[in-house]
C-alpha cells in the first residue's frame, strides 16, 4: 500500500484502502479504490467545481466522493449495490471531513 494512500485516508478521516475480493465473481467486480493520484488529476483539471454534483456509480467505500468533495467543494452522491460495502461508506461519512457534502444510495446503477 502506497504511503500517499494512507496519508489521504487519514487526512480525510476515512478508511478506504485495500482490495476486497470476497464477493467478486463473473458478474461483480471486487472492491478496489481509485488511487489518489488519479483523483488528484481529476480534481485539478478544473471541470468539477463547487457548483457541480458528482454522481459516482459503484462508489464502494466512498473514496471518490470524499476526496473530490474535499478538493473541489462539490456535492457528491455515491451509488453502491453491495450492502456490506455501502455500510462501510456510511460509516466513513459519519467521520469524514467532507461528510456533510456526501450522500450514498443503496441500489443498483440501473435503478438509480
Regions found by a protein language model. Give the residues of each.
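S-adenosyl-L-methionine
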Residues: 1-49
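Glycine-rich SAM-binding Motif I of class I
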Residues: 62-66
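Short loop/turn elements that flank and shape the SAM/SAH-binding pocket of Class I
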Residues: 110-112
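Short beta-strand element of Class I
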Residues: 74-79
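Conserved class I S-adenosyl-L-methionine
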Residues: 51-60
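Conserved SAM/SAH-binding beta-strand->alpha-helix loop
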Residues: 82
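Conserved SAM-binding loop
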Residues: 89-90
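Conserved SAM-binding strand-loop segment of SAM-dependent methyltransferases
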Residues: 98-108
